[in-house]
Structure formats: structure tokens, C-alpha cells
């Protein structure tokens, strides 16, 4: 189980990313389309003034059951341990053991 503070930090980051997504994407698009170097510099400064945690890069995929940050399968949102455990119990529809 991950520390509660780390899970809370990621939840906070997720909310902040959602809050600033429109503004950040508009600035990034303007930055890509700007031809004048001074205009690009000004837009870059505006992007830098946004909160650091509003960047989607800073979010971390975590297991929704345990909060573990590593070995998380995107399709299920579960870490490898929980995925294996739940698949053996038959709690994941469509998941079967492979045999060849």
C-alpha cells in the first residue's frame, strides 16, 4: 500500500491538470503557431507561469486498489499483483490464463 500522502498528492495533481488543461493547450497551440521569436518568448513565459503541477507529465499512474505507482496496467488500472490475484479469482471479465 502506498503512503496516503503520495496518493493525495497525485489526486491533487490530477485536479490541477484538469483545471488548467484548456489554458495550457491554448498556450501550447499559440506557441507552435507563433512565427515571431519575441512572441514565442512571451508565450513561453506565460506557460512557465502556470503551476508546475498543472502539467500532465507530472501525473503518475497508480493502482486504484492499492495505490502502488509501479507495474500498473493501463487497461485495468491495477498493479501486476492485484491483476494476477483478481484474474485468478475470476473477477476480471474476459481475462483467461494463457496456455499453448
Curated annotation (Swiss-Prot):
Organism: Synechococcus sp. (strain RCC307)
Keyword set includes Membrane: no
Quaternary data: Part of the 30S ribosomal subunit. Contacts proteins S3 and S10.
Protein family per UniProt: Belongs to the universal ribosomal protein uS14 family.
Descriptive protein name: Small ribosomal subunit protein uS14
Keywords assigned by UniProt, alphabetized: Ribonucleoprotein, Ribosomal protein, RNA-binding, rRNA-binding
Any single Gene Ontology cellular-component annotation: cytoplasm
Source organism, top-level taxon: Bacteria
Amino acid at each position: 500500500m502506498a503512503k496516503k500522502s503520495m496518493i493525495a498528492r497525485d489526486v491533487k495533481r490530477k485536479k490541477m491538470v484538469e483545471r488548467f488543461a484548456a489554458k495550457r493547450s491554448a498556450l501550447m497551440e499559440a506557441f507552435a503557431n507563433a512565427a515571431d521569436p519575441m512572441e514565442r518568448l512571451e508565450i513561453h513565459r506565460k506557460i512557465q507561469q502556470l503551476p508546475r503541477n498543472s502539467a500532465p507529465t507530472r501525473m503518475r499512474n497508480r493502482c486504484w486498489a492499492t495505490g502502488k505507482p509501479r507495474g500498473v496496467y493501463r487497461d485495468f488500472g491495477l498493479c501486476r499483483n492485484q491483476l494476477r490475484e483478481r484474474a485468478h479469482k475470476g473477477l476480471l471479465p474476459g481475462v483467461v490464463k494463457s496456455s499453448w
